[in-house]
């Protein structure tokens, strides 16, 4: 017997949940990947993708076909699907989907700011921006010289505005400060998204909170790894860590003091969920920390579909689709560069 909350969920969101589950069922199978890695050219790859849910998404692309064109068209296809979900959603699912776009908006802003710093044309950089993170005021990013300028001129009317409260400063936006800004924005964003899911409760909280806890900890670990050998002080490093993960508070305090990968690994070894991930780094497969994080993310997102009546399936589907796209780009790059020895080093999903 369905509980009242579940009945209301079906009334408001049941159609879209059914739709996204159908989309998940159309992800590439292991047999599809076996066929893709046997392709000799990008044209062969295109022909095989036409037999999958991707269909004729490359029909309008002129020769020569490039990896970049394939990647761009896959992103556009995902964006069209997501826009359909968002355009037909009711609250609070609409807000949840808006939260999902914020990470792409942050990446786009940072991309545009770095482009302005390197004197690249806005048009050139806009072409590289993720379609899920596009917003009207993006082109004005190049006029901002400080975070305060950026907020006043560009972001005040966007969903990112609340995350800027901890980032306001008059520091010139050089390469280091832009990267610090990215991490501060992500920290505020993840903590706000986590609070939204936790406050929502029900199955959405059960599914999304562990996923966002993992994402917060992954960011803390990657920030730590990338800060070794840089000017970033240990105190500043700690201010960039999201506090909604399992590492909070003691693990984050220890990570802030870590001076090399081995010390970082010792911190992770204290947490049952992260020890096996670090143990898997290197070894016969030559996996990187990023590889094992992606594998863990895929596992969590696949499991999200085992539960019903929650918003997490929308998040999980987009993340799984992105991993599928990374896999296709990896295979396409190996084919394009005739570097087939590592063509099977993609991350399986189903």
UniProtKB/Swiss-Prot annotation:
What would be an example GO MF term here? proton-transporting ATPase activity, rotational mechanism
Has keyword Mitochondrion?
A: no
What keywords are annotated for this sequence in UniProt?
Answer: Hydrogen ion transport, Ion transport, Transport
Q: In which tissues is it expressed?
A: Predominantly expressed in the kidney. Also expressed in the lung, testis, skeletal muscle and heart. Upr-egulated during osteoclast differentiation and is most abundant in mature osteoclasts.
> GO cellular component annotations, sorted alphabetically?
apical plasma membrane; early endosome; proton-transporting V-type ATPase, V0 domain; vacuolar proton-transporting V-type ATPase complex
Query: Which parts of the chain span the membrane according to its record?
Result: none
Is Ion transport a UniProt keyword of this protein? yes
One Pfam family, please name it.
vATP-synt_AC39
* Self-association and partners: V-ATPase is a heteromultimeric enzyme made up of two complexes: the ATP-hydrolytic V1 complex and the proton translocation V0 complex. The V1 complex consists of three catalytic AB heterodimers that form a heterohexamer, three peripheral stalks each consisting of EG heterodimers, one central rotor including subunits D and F, and the regulatory subunits C and H. The proton translocation complex V0 consists of the proton transport subunit a, a ring of proteolipid subunits c9c'', rotary subunit d, subunits e and f, and the accessory subunits ATP6AP1/Ac45 and ATP6AP2/PRR.
Biological role:
Subunit of the V0 complex of vacuolar(H+)-ATPase (V-ATPase), a multisubunit enzyme composed of a peripheral complex (V1) that hydrolyzes ATP and a membrane integral complex (V0) that translocates protons. V-ATPase is responsible for acidifying and maintaining the pH of intracellular compartments and in some cell types, is targeted to the plasma membrane, where it is responsible for acidifying the extracellular environment. May play a role in coupling of proton transport and ATP hydrolysis. Regulator of osteoclast fusion and bone formation.
Q: Family membership, please give it.
A: Belongs to the V-ATPase V0D/AC39 subunit family.
The protein's name: V-type proton ATPase subunit d 2
Source taxonomy: Eukaryota, Metazoa, Chordata, Craniata, Vertebrata
GN (gene name): Atp6v0d2
């Amino acid at each position: 017997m369905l509980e009242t909350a579940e009945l209301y969920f079906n009334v408001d969101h049941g159609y879209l949940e059914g739709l996204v589950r159908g989309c998940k069922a159309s992800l590439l199978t292991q047999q599809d990947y076996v066929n893709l890695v046997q392709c000799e050219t990008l044209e062969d790859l295109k022909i095989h993708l036409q037999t999958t849910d991707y269909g004729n998404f490359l029909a309008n692309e002129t020769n020569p076909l490039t990896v970049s064109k394939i990647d761009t068209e896959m992103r556009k296809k995902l964006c069209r699907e997501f826009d359909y979900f968002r355009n037909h959603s009711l609250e609070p699912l609409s807000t949840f989907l808006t939260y999902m776009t914020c990470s792409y908006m942050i990446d786009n802003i940072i991309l545009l700011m770095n482009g302005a710093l390197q004197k690249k044309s806005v048009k050139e950089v806009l072409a590289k921006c993720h379609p899920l993170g596009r917003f009207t005021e993006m082109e004005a990013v190049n006029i901002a010289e400080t975070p305060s300028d950026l907020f006043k001129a560009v972001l005040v009317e966007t969903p990112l505005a609340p995350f800027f409260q901890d980032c306001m400063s008059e520091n010139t936006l050089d390469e280091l400060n832009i990267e610090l800004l990215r991490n501060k924005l992500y920290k505020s964003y993840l903590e706000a998204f986590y609070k939204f899911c936790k406050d929502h409760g029900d199955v959405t909280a059960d599914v999304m909170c562990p996923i966002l806890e993992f994402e917060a900890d992954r960011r803390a670990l990657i920030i730590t790894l990338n800060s070794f050998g840089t000017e970033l002080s240990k105190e500043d490093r700690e201010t960039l860590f999201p506090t909604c993960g399992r590492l909070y508070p003691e693990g984050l305090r220890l990570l802030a003091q870590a001076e090399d990968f081995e010390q970082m690994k010792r911190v992770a070894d204290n947490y049952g969920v992260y020890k096996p991930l670090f143990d898997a780094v290197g070894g016969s497969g030559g996996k990187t920390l990023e590889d094992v994080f992606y594998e863990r993310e895929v596992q969590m997102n696949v499991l999200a579909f085992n539960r019903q009546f929650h918003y997490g399936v929308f998040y999980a589907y987009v993340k799984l689709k992105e991993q599928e796209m990374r896999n296709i780009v990896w295979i396409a790059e190996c084919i394009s560069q005739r570097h087939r020895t590592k063509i099977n080093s993609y991350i399986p999903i189903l």
